[in-house]
Amino acid sequence: MKEDISKVVIYTDGACSGNPGPGGWGALLQFNEVNKEIFGHELETTNNRMEITAALEALKILKKPCHVEIYTDSKYLQQGITVWIHNWIKNNWCKSNNEPVKNADLWQNLYEELSKHTIIWKWVKGHASNSGNIAADKLAVQGRQTAIEILKCRG
């Protein structure tokens, strides 16, 4: 009997010039022998927002429930979504010191997307020898460069 749920491997990355500053995000999605590359940008953002956005946008591409392995070089993203988020939800999106969670809007949207899939989060060393991470980094840099070019045109 064939398994109904597809397996997808996703590599994500974010890039930012300045923090905050122009930024980009990128993701490589792999399903069977097919690779899909996506990227985007924001004119004023942070590296952490771009890391979360990369994972969020990659998951939004999926049309049906999947078994997903997400590879990220961001400890912030990996720890945030696997460890910290449970307390944030319990504390109404506040940290233990009662300060609001940064990027709560993105965390909430990402958490909602997670409920549609079975997900394993894996951390990889950035700028190393992992070809998927290298591809995601190039896409994020491409997104960041787009933001920089737009800002140059605006003067």
Curated annotation (Swiss-Prot):
It catalyses: Endonucleolytic cleavage to 5'-phosphomonoester. It is found in: Cytoplasm. Its EC number is 3.1.26.4. Mg(2+) 2 binds at residues 13, 137. GO terms for biological process: DNA replication, removal of RNA primer. Binds 1 Mg(2+) ion per subunit. May bind a second metal ion at a regulatory site, or after substrate binding. Gene3D superfamilies: Ribonuclease H-like superfamily/Ribonuclease H. It is an enzyme of class 3 (hydrolase). This is Ribonuclease H. It comes from Rickettsia bellii (strain RML369-C).
